[in-house]
């Protein structure tokens, strides 16, 4: 089996990323153009996992404009064939390692029914010996009646020296 490579995304990856997200319910599918923009403007904080030249994982993340010490993880997707191999965790570790020393927190939003993502985030915090906090952020009234509320998860402070040890 070929090795999995983690790297920054290229604009040419956007189509494959869009398809990967579309195939990863319950993630919200966004336009292809949005993924082009992420690959172009946020490549320093987004990560692609590649196997045999195929995109099999993607993490979209950015440094929060209101909290420059925080990496906000927006979406994480892994191809069904490659799940439960630690790829999602490595995507987040890779994104964190691309940031400067001032980033000490990870934030993400998660719906109450997305128990897999919630468990992943709790385990991620445990792996880094970091605090895990969760609170309501956006209500379904704001997001629309067909969308569950989104809770904000905050993990940290993160000691960057632990990234190499736990990866």
Question: How should each PLM-predicted stretch be described?
Answer:
Residues 112-134:
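Conserved active-site alpha-helix within GNAT-family acetyltransferase domains
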Residues 75-83, 110-111:
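A short, internal acetyl-CoA/4′-phosphopantetheine-binding micro-motif in the GNAT/acyltransferase core
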Residues 48, 54-63, 70-72, 77:
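Conserved beta-strand in the GNAT
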Residues 128-167:
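C-terminal "cap" of GNAT-fold acetyltransferases
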Residues 78, 84-97, 119, 123:
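Conserved acetyl-CoA-binding loop-helix of GNAT-fold acetyltransferases
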Residues 99-112:
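Conserved GNAT acetyl-CoA-binding A-motif
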Residues 28-37:
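A short, aromatic/hydrophobic, helix- or strand-capping loop or linear motif
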Residues 4-17:
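A short beta-loop-alpha structural element at the N-terminal edge
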């Amino acid at each position: 089996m070929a090795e999995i490579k983690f790297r920054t995304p290229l604009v040419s990856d956007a189509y494959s990323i869009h398809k990967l997200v579309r195939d990863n319910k319950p993630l919200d599918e966004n336009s292809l153009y949005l993924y082009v923009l992420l690959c172009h403007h946020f490549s320093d904080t987004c990560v692609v996992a590649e196997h045999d030249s195929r995109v099999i994982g993607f993490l979209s993340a950015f440094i929060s404009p209101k909290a420059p010490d925080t990496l906000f993880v927006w979406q994480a997707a892994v191809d069904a064939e490659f799940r439960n191999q630690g790829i999602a965790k490595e995507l987040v570790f890779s994104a964190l390692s691309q940031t400067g020393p001032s980033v000490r927190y990870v934030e993400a939003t998660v719906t109450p029914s997305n128990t897999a993502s919630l468990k992943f985030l709790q385990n991620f915090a445990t792996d880094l010996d970091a605090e895990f906090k969760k609170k309501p952020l956006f209500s379904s009234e704001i997001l629309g009646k067909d969308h569950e509320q989104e809770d904000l998860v905050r993990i940290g402070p993160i000691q960057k020296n632990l990234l190499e040890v736990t990866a």
